[in-house]
From Swiss-Prot:
Highest classification ranks of the organism: Eukaryota, Metazoa, Chordata, Craniata, Vertebrata
Ranges of biased composition (kind: Basic and acidic residues): 68-83
Pfam families listed in its UniProt record: SPAN-X (PF07458)
Name of the protein in its database record: Sperm protein associated with the nucleus on the X chromosome B1
Underlying gene: SPANXB1
Positions of the UniProt region annotated as Disordered: 1-103
Motif Nuclear localization signal positions after renumbering to this chain: 43-51
Length: 103
């Protein structure tokens, strides 16, 4: 059998300069500097006062309409291209509204 070489690892009391540079780079990656040059986090913005009025959310979507013939389908596409969706009949759409309760 051949000779086995033993490797001794000594701990350094002072870290290597390249390690210090790597640690500094890692710190910069995790905490970016602010425009003023410091890395302190900014305080959270204050909450704005809510208005007294209710919020209304309107969601409009077209219902699926059954068509029996290709001619009806072609006529419907031509109609959709001519008419603005806001001008279509109300019964073709479902409207959902929500209101925020007053506090």
């Amino acid at each position: 059998m051949g000779q086995q070489s033993s490797v001794r690892r000594l701990k350094r009391s002072v870290p290597c300069e390249s390690n210090e540079a790597n640690e500094a780079n890692e710190a910069n990656k995790t905490m970016p500097e602010t425009p003023t040059g410091d890395s302190d986090p900014q305080p959270a913005p204050k909450k704005m006062k809510t208005s007294e009025s209710s919020t209304i959310l309107v969601v409009r979507y077209r219902r699926n309409v059954k068509r029996t013939s290709p001619e009806e389908l072609l006529n419907d596409h031509a109609r959709e291209n001519r008419i603005n969706p806001d001008q279509m009949e109300e019964e073709e759409f479902i409207e959902i509204t929500t209101e925020r309760p007053k506090k």
